[in-house]
Amino acid sequence: MTIQMNPYLNFNGNTEEAFNFYKSVFGGDFAVVMRFKDNPECGAMSEDDKERIMHIALPIDGGGMLMATDSLESLGQKLAVGNNFYISLSPETREGADRLFAGLSDGGKVEMQMTDMFWGYFGCFADKFGVQWMLNVGNNQPN
C-alpha cells in the first residue's frame, strides 16, 4: 500500500501570511487555496472567517507538500502551541484509510469520524499518545 505523508499546520488566522512567507523561501506555486467561503456549508460564519484559509498546500521540492488551515474560534477550535499541527496521511483507498483510522485512533480521541466531505473521504483524531492525525482520500483517488 502506498501512503503519502505530509505535515499539516494550524494557524491563528494568519495562514495566508505564513504561506506567502514559505512560498518566498521554497518557491513554486500553491497547489490549492481553499477559503472557508468555498465550503457550501459555511453557513452563518462572519465575513472575516469566510475569508480565512480552510486549506492551502505548497509543494516542496522532493515530492513533499506543506499544508495548513486557519483554526477558527467560531468553530470551537482553540489553537495552542503543541496542537498546531497534524500528520496528514493520504492512502490510496477508502479501505486503507479506514484501516489506518481504526488502528491509529484506538485508545485515542476522535475529532471527526471518516466521512464523505465535498473534497473527499476524510477523518481526524489524536492517537493515545496525543499525536494528531488526518486521513484523506481525495475524490480523484480510487474508492
Each language-model region and where it sits:
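Short, small/polar residue-rich loop motifs at catalytic or cofactor-binding pockets
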Residues: 118-120
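Glyoxalase I/VOC metalloenzyme domain signal
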Residues: 1-115, 124-143
